[in-house]
Amino acid sequence: NVVQTPMFLNSRDEFKNYLGKSKKPFMATFYKEVRKKSGILMGADGNPIGGKWSFDEDNRNKLPKDISIPKFPKINETNHTKKLKPVIEKLFKDHPGSTNDFWLATDYNDVVKLLDFFIKEKSNLFGDYEDAVNQKNNILFHSALSPYMNLGLITPEFIIKKILEFHKKHKIRMNSL
């Protein structure tokens, strides 16, 4: 028995229903159905805002060499993090990475801080360079919020709400929404 959770926008039953009525299921078709049902990025006339369902073709730009990529804000180290660092260094000393550049938020307030940073500093260029790769920066204009959703620190609904509120005032480009 699966319990519905706010960590997903759709329930298993909703997805099963979609699969049951689709001869050829595609994620693009499912997303279209979800947008219609939820009203996310939909106009009052029932059509998608921006005139089309997908802007994927606009999300494949090459990253310019001279582009400035905003650095994530520093997350304050908690007492819990301070206690865990020596344990991590001992148990995982042969693994890549360092606790010296620990950037993960460990509480809700810091996750919201990272969301706000993404929305204000990265979201407008996210779409343009969504598929770009760079050896010096593996996050680029992505939000890096997935771990926090997976840990239950923030919900997809809250993220969508905050981004759309910002978009009303500051107009994020459609391929970034």
Question: PLM features: residue spans?
Answer:
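Catalytic cores of enzymes that engage adenine nucleotides and/or redox cofactors via long glycine-rich
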Residues: 59-177
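Beta-rich, aromatic/charged-enriched effector core domains that present basic-aromatic interfaces
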Residues: 1-104
